[in-house]
């Protein structure tokens, strides 16, 4: 599976059961990135996406158990460490801001198992700068 996650400067993902931030330009970027591949997410995350813009949108609260090689998984509020051995690529979108957080990204990207292979910046709607970092094993 290919994981997509949005993180603040401290690796935060959620605070008080809510996403830290969102950006409609980012949603369009994710739709283009996924193309005609399957994109999995839970019901909470699906609320922010336009199902018509993503051809193969799959919504299931157990989506990390359903995804197979080559499938994308948009993750906001799930622990990923238990699934790390099945993850082939990680795509991180960074907000370049610090938000309150009580749930953090739980895979160590600096520990040597993952190497950054691409980094791109773009301007969002509500964020002056969003970075996309792609990590491979």
Name each model feature, range by range.
Residues 1-137:
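Enzymes that bind and transform nitrogen-containing heteroaromatic metabolites
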